[in-house]
């Protein structure tokens, strides 16, 4: 029943709205549509205009000198501007950014002190000496290198100074070039970046060694100095040790987190690395795999005789053609035979050369601190078993040793301790709420949008719906019947078809509830009767109650004759009679 009643009310509302719009006429409908469109446009424009910020960014990442020069230029042009708290961004009112950029570009802003090869664009070739050209070339090279350095993450600004070797006919020794770099670093700058800057500058300048480049920051801290090649290696070693320690620490945390939970343990890892370069050459021979390459055989044989005469020298030896017999002497005979054989073999050999340019872990030192309260919670019983903590520490030590890859032969050390952790600082502190004024200022745009929308809706109701409601609430003429006290004329019951005055009066006197019920049940009949021609409606009224119609006509004639104005509440009882 409730759904049917809602449908009937909705249909009645639609019919009433159609009837009301039909009574307004074409001019009023057009005016109402224009007012609604204007209000919707005003709401949309107000929402967009108040929702965007009052200032927009013009340039970001500017140096202080550029900000000062651009501020002076905008002030001369009469363009309002604002500078952010970091001092590197300029804001202008919305809609003036394009004009401001064009004006600043005309003034050559923003510009930088690091001018590059564009120095040659503004320089004439006539009247320049070789010295001036060389100075300009060095300045341009310094500016280009500084621009490249500023592109590195963590470098806000850079300044480069280069000293090139001077060539001369009367110089005996060769002068080596050198360079210095001053940077303004931010949070993301590291020591490895300083070494990268040295390599960059050395590669950009001919005959410049990286060891001759000095890098420092604006705070006066020396990041890399000339002639410190060993220092660079030490920095690389320290960075490598830090990376290895971080990797081992992550492995330990991944192993302990599922068991103890994050926040219930702390780890510390120290790694000592050996980064010495090693070169090993090893040659291996295989005697089992010999091959006969050549054979050499030498044979020698000999026969020798030796006679010795012991006769004394005299006349007989000096007589010619005289055979002298050896009477006394010694004789010997020697015979030799030698054989030499030489065989050459080819033996397989293997030569291995090993160059180690990496690193090796000399020692690891690991410390693990565990929350004892959390460790006792894992027991599952209260109180925990005896020696429970010691057993758990032993298990955790083995787990950490496996996760970190400890080797006791190289002297690795591990220490696991269970203690009671303190409550984190500020855990019981309540968050400080921001003042309501700050919240109001941050939400001022939203509040302005809401007020604008409410104002637009109010205007729409005042200028659009209010006239419609006023026309709807106007009672149609003839809904009430003027009752004369003397004639005892009651309100006619034209809807229900009452036959006597008493029944009509009783319907009205029955109270608001009875009257509302009667109006609901007869509303459809009344609409049908109102659509009928006036002549037919008048005939039906006369047929229903002739005496009442006659009484009303007599009252009108009497009022017209006396010149007295009729009461609207009484004169509007029978609109059908007036329409007729």
UniProtKB/Swiss-Prot annotation:
Cellular compartments annotated: Cell inner membrane; Bacterial flagellum basal body
Transmembrane segments: 29-49, 445-465
Keywords: Bacterial flagellum, Cell inner membrane, Cell membrane, Membrane, Transmembrane, Transmembrane helix
Polar residues biased stretches: 309-331
Superkingdom of the source species: Bacteria
GO molecular function (one): cytoskeletal motor activity
One annotated GO biological process: bacterial-type flagellum-dependent cell motility
Biased segments, Basic and acidic residues type: 274-308, 332-341
Membrane topology category: Multi-pass membrane protein
Region Disordered, residue ranges: 273-341
InterPro entries: AMP-bd_C_sf (IPR045851), Flag_M-ring_C (IPR013556), FlgMring_FliF (IPR000067), FliF_N_dom (IPR006182), YscJ/FliF (IPR043427)
GO cellular component, one term: bacterial-type flagellum basal body, MS ring
Protein family according to the UniProt entry: Belongs to the FliF family.
Self-association and partners: The basal body constitutes a major portion of the flagellar organelle and consists of five rings (E,L,P,S, and M) mounted on a central rod. The M ring is integral to the inner membrane of the cell and may be connected to the flagellar rod via the S ring. The S (supramembrane ring) lies just distal to the M ring. The L and P rings lie in the outer membrane and the periplasmic space, respectively.
Function, in words: The M ring may be actively involved in energy transduction.
Protein name: Flagellar M-ring protein FliF
Organism of this sequence: Brucella suis biovar 1 (strain 1330)
Encoding gene, per UniProt annotation: fliF
